[in-house]
């Protein structure tokens, strides 16, 4: 059988976009910046493959702890443990205060 354990497996409904929101995201989502200590939501943008976090973190909220090139380093709780996630800004949304 063919290899079937890719990074996007089991994402048929999780990464689906609305019909009107299909296509590439606006430039404002690419150039957004965050401050260290700021809370952000991990919302995977399925049309952008670069800098995409693991599907496990889709819908989670984390804290920005640094920057790695164009991507941001986040601290996200996964059960009892705290994990570091690297994601580009297209896959992040700032939490409203």
UniProtKB/Swiss-Prot annotation:
State any single GO MF term.
structural constituent of ribosome
Q: Does the keyword Ribosomal protein apply?
A: yes
Q: What processes in GO biological process is this protein linked to?
A: translation
**Which PROSITE patterns does the UniProt record give?**
RIBOSOMAL_L21E
This entry carries the following GO cellular component terms, namely:
ribonucleoprotein complex; ribosome
Q: InterPro entries annotated for this entry? A: Ribosomal_eL21 (IPR001147), Ribosomal_eL21_arc (IPR022856), Ribosomal_eL21_CS (IPR018259), Ribosomal_eL21_sf (IPR036948), Translation_prot_SH3-like_sf (IPR008991)
Keywords assigned: Ribonucleoprotein, Ribosomal protein
Note the Pfam families from the entry: Ribosomal_L21e (PF01157)
Question: Does the entry feature the keyword Ribonucleoprotein, yes or no?
Answer: yes
Regarding protein family, the annotation reads: Belongs to the eukaryotic ribosomal protein eL21 family.
Q: Note the NCBIfam families from the entry.
A: PRK04306.1
Instruction: Please state what the protein is called.
Output: Large ribosomal subunit protein eL21
From what organism does this protein derive? Methanoculleus marisnigri (strain ATCC 35101 / DSM 1498 / JR1)
């Amino acid at each position: 059988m063919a290899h079937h354990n890719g990074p996007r497996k089991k994402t048929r409904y999780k990464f689906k976009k609305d019909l009107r929101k299909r296509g590439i995201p606006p430039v404002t989502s690419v150039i957004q910046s965050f401050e260290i200590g700021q809370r952000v939501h991990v919302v995977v943008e399925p049309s952008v493959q670069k800098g995409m976090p693991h599907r496990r973190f889709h819908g989670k909220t984390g804290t920005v702890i640094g920057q790695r090139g164009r991507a941001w380093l986040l601290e996200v709780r996964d059960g009892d443990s705290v994990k570091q996630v690297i994601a580009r800004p297209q896959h992040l949304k700032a939490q409203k205060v």
